[in-house]
Regions:
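Glycine-rich flexible loops
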Residues: 1-203
Length: 203
């Protein structure tokens, strides 16, 4: 039996992941963005996919372009607001095949007050304690570079599965070898964040 990724094109898979994330509180209407690389072509969700379409997007809405023509991709009016961070990750780590920026329900309380998230479950130990990038303006090239700085110490994690960076008062960004693994890791991290929060109930 073929896996979900084997049954779909990259644009179809991005649409699937978008809806899965929204329906499972892994992101919200306020934002988030998803991208994937297939050879020399990049694919990204359009800007305001949550705000304007409630993540009910189709393959025709996906922004795409060759890696060799990044400037053209940036000029597309649908270029996602966090696109600079996605592009910086792909440039710094050519083996990365997917990037997800999200606002997961149980990670949000941590990023609201810039608290790191320790691993509590065996499923999340591989990610270590989730850390923040240094302060930077949202959607800026400065932010993109500071995200890359945090990921530089996590290359082994990205090559094996995925690595994450927490974004102050904003959300999380995850880089992985492929999109399904990135999605898997976003959910693991969100479940782990819930587990950390739930410890208070057991005291």
């Amino acid at each position: 039996m073929k896996s979900i990724a084997e049954r779909m094109t990259i644009p179809q898979l991005i649409v699937y992941v978008s809806k899965f994330m929204f329906e499972n509180d892994l992101t919200d209407i306020a934002g988030g963005n998803i991208s994937a690389r297939d050879g020399d072509v990049l694919y990204m969700t359009p800007t305001l996919a949550g705000n304007q379409w409630h993540w009910n997007i189709d393959t025709d809405d996906i922004v795409s372009g060759p890696v060799t023509k990044i400037d053209d991709l940036k000029q597309d009016p649908r270029f996602t607001r966090e696109g600079l961070s996605h592009l910086a990750i792909y440039k710094a780590f050519p083996y990365v095949g997917a990037v997800i920026h999200a606002h997961p329900k149980y990670i949000n309380p941590f990023v609201a007050c810039s608290k790191t998230i320790p691993p509590m479950l065996s499923a999340s130990m591989q990610f270590g304690e989730l850390q923040y990038h240094a302060e930077a303006a949202h959607y800026s090239q400065d932010q993109a570079e500071k995200i890359v700085d945090v990921l530089k110490s996590q290359e082994e994690r990205m090559q094996k599965k995925a690595a994450a960076v927490l974004m102050p008062r904003h959300g999380i960004i995850v880089a992985s070898m492929n999109l399904m693994t990135a999605l898997d890791c976003v959910q693991r991290m969100n479940t782990n964040a819930f587990t950390v929060l739930a410890q208070k109930w057991l005291e």
